[in-house]
Amino acid sequence: MKELSPSILSAELSNIKQQLEQVKAAGIKYLHIDVMDGLFVPNITIGQPYIKSLRKLSDLIFDVHLMIEKPERYIESFAEAGADILTIHYEACTHLDRALHQIKDNGMKAGVTINPSTPINILSEVLPIADLVLVMSVNPGFGGQSFIENSVSKLEWLKEVRQKENYNYIIEVDGGVKTSNIEKISNAGAELFVAGSAVFNDKYIKENIDGLYKKIR
């Protein structure tokens, strides 16, 4: 089943309880939470204390994406905060294999991702242990960017390798996803779609979600 993972980066944080209720009522199962440290990417966003507070408000699957240096330092604390999926960057982690196992050992699904300029096949050695592979289709750090077209071939490659090798990872895409391109992205192999401004860009959250789902289901 194809699913959306609305990005909290585009939500109205002062009204987050109501917006979480709205997305769940519209059939959403996942919530994408971007964590940025101001070093790996320019922006600084939320951390473990805020995620812990969100956990009290929602039983959605927390799809947490760490855009931080040396993410292995914080794996246990994000598990304690309530993350269900923890995705880390190849570029930010020296011992990627060990870190992915550490995520699993802390009871979370282990996700791995790369920046748009990094070749997708560089992840070949960790695909057997990954629960999720996230294709960044914009440069990480800011919402509202345009989709990078060469991301389509990365999705196709991941789909082909998974089928050939009988791997089990979920293929996720993040960046520039909207109603005009989500069908093409879905056909390339994506199954989980991070959508920020396409969901939270106005007060019609349910209508936005319905419009996206109609393109992929």
Where are these regions (language model features)?
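Generic enzyme active-site microenvironment
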Residues: 32, 172-173
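Short, electropositive alpha-helical surface patch
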Residues: 83-91, 186-195
